[in-house]
Structures are given as structure tokens and as C-alpha cells.
Amino acid sequence: MSLKDQLIHNVHKEEHSHAHNKISVVGVGAVGMACAISILMKDLADELALVDVVEDKLKGEMLDLQHGSLFLRTPKIVSGKDYSVTAHSKLVIVTAGARQQEGESRLNLVQRNVNIFKVIIPNVVKYSPDCKLLIVSNPVDILTYVAWKISGFPKHRVIGSGCNLDSARFRHLMGERLGIHPLSCHGWIVGEHGDSSVPVWSGVNVAGVSLKALHPDMGTDADKEHWKEVHKQVVDSAYEVIKLKGYTSWAIGLSVADLAETIMKNLRRVHPISTVVKGMHGIKEDVFLSVPCVLGSSGITDVVKMILKPEEEDKLRKSADTLWGIQKELQF
């Protein structure tokens, strides 16, 4: 009789049923691992699967997380280069791809990452045909479109992390200026995640008090307080962090875990995330841009109709045109 048999009397033989709240992360670079640890710390999954092509790094990251099991509430952490480890996922987060170099625009990464997605997406779909796909790899808006096209999924199940982080950065910087926690500073950044994102100044408020009503020059060149600089800092922030530490990881990891929580718990919170915007704000092409979306366990169920100023709509359409110009040239 083994020690285990002496210690434990078995009452019921469990059939090996699969996890009920499984999350998979594709890519165990800095961003993928920041997503993984943020998700583990929020107790969102009963199983976490990691996938990558670099096997030693992958196994090392898995073991390192498993060694912290005592301090976590996620009983199963697995990894493999084969996508069978991701089977039956509720949510699959894709962070894999070529990394943005210092000074490189997100759009420059495109074709390099499309080729990577041609391998990843069909494998994800094969093992988790009912999952939600959350795309994080840059340029996120275009790659979300690519994932949608390759997967054949309905659009509500293919989500780009989009401006969830840009808006968080904006609210942080707004909070720094006002001496108020970002949770109480409300403001939305929409459009492209990156250089042509659009700050919606008309909606910026604290406790329902419109800052633009108090300070009409806000966000314009005439503004003596230079609030436009806050949006410029948001746009520059990734470049600054990349210049200083080589990559960004923690904020995007936390931002992705925030989205994962909304999905896994069916919270129906509104997030600025990337979805198909055809037919909205005068956009005629199949492009993905961030707009305020109601998010839950089936993915994106609704979009909040923002009231934008004509110049804000123009910027959004310009973003759409830029993205479409690139998308229509893609080979996949």
C-alpha cells in the first residue's frame, strides 16, 4: 500500500473532465508573462495554459509560476509548444509576434506579424472553437482584423486590447495633474491604439463635472494649461518606456487582466477596445478601431454610440483610412 493510499481514502473516481474557466496565453515574452501573472493574481481561471515556440523559455516560465502555486488559486498551470494544451479555453490571449524596436512604429510590424498569425490562429481555433480571442500583439487593430479573417469567428468573439491601456494612461496622467485617483478621473481615448488615437475631450469629467465646460480651451492649441500635452504623453508613453527599459509589459499585462476579468465574470463593463467599426461614424471599410464596447462572457455584445465633435469624427475616419490602406495590401 502506497503512502498516498494509507493517507487518503478515495470516495469518488473522477472522470478527467476539462477545466471550466480556462485561459490560454500565446507568447511568453515580457507582455505574455505580465498578462499571465496579472490573471493569476486576480484568480480568474481554474487552468492557465502557455504556448510559445521557444521551448526552454516556455518550460522555465511554467515551472517558475508553478513554484508559486501555494500563493495562487489556479490549480493547474500547463505549457507546450503544441496547441493541444490550449484545448477547451474560454479565452485565448495572443501576445506573440515580432517585438517593436526602438523608434519603430506599430504599423511597421504588420507583415512580420501577419505571417506569425497564419500559424497561431488556425491552431487556436482547432482546439478552442468556441473561445473568445483577445489580440494584444501590435499593431493591434490590424492584427485583430487579421485574426478575425483567419479564424472565421463571428466579430463579437474577436477582440483587440485596443485603447483600454491608452485610456488608462490618460486617466493616470489626468489624475496626476488633479491629485485624484485615476478611477475617479473619467476620459476616453478611442480610435487607433497608437499614434493616431483620438482623445474625446468633451467627455472628460470628474464626478460628472465636465472639465471642458469649466475650461473651454481644453485640448486645443489655445489652452494655457496645455492639456493637449496629456494626450501627447499617452501617445509617446510606449516609446518612452521602450527607450528606457527595452519593452513595455506591466501596464499592458494589467490592462489585459482587466479585460479578462470582464469576460470571465460576465461583468458587462464598458471598455475602449477594438472591434469592427464599419457603419459607425461614417466609416465604410472593415476596419477595427477602439470604441466603447459592452464586454461580457460572449464577447462584445454592444457598442455605446459616442457623441463626437466633427473634428473628432474626422480624426477617427483618418485612422480608418490609414489602417485600410495597410490592410488591403496584406498577404494572408
UniProtKB/Swiss-Prot annotation:
Reaction it catalyzes: (S)-lactate + NAD(+) = pyruvate + NADH + H(+)
Q: Which domain of life does this protein belong to?
A: Eukaryota
Residues the record lists as binding substrate: R106, N138, R169, T248
The places in or outside the cell where this protein is found are: Cytoplasm
Pfam short name (any one): Ldh_1_C
Cysteines paired by S-S bonds: none
Q: What molecular function terms (GO) are annotated for this protein?
A: L-lactate dehydrogenase activity
Q: Which UniProt keywords apply?
A: Cytoplasm, NAD, Oxidoreductase
Residues reported to bind NAD(+): 29-57, 99, 138
Gene Ontology process terms (BP): lactate metabolic process
An example of a Gene Ontology cellular component annotation for this protein is:
cytoplasm
Which pathway does it take part in? Fermentation; pyruvate fermentation to lactate; (S)-lactate from pyruvate: step 1/1
* UniProt-listed InterPro entries: L-lactate/malate_DH, L-lactate_DH, L-lactate_DH_AS, Lactate/malate_DH_C, Lactate/malate_DH_N, Lactate_DH/Glyco_Ohase_4_C, NAD(P)-bd_dom_sf
Alphabetized CDD domains for the sequence: LDH_1
Catalytic residues? H193 (proton acceptor)
Against PROSITE patterns, the record matches this protein to: L_LDH
Q: Which EC number applies?
A: 1.1.1.27
User: What role does this protein play?
Assistant: Interconverts simultaneously and stereospecifically pyruvate and lactate with concomitant interconversion of NADH and NAD(+).
Subunit-level organization? Homotetramer.
Family label: Belongs to the LDH/MDH superfamily. LDH family.
Identification of the protein by name: L-lactate dehydrogenase A chain
Q: Which organism is it from?
A: Columba livia
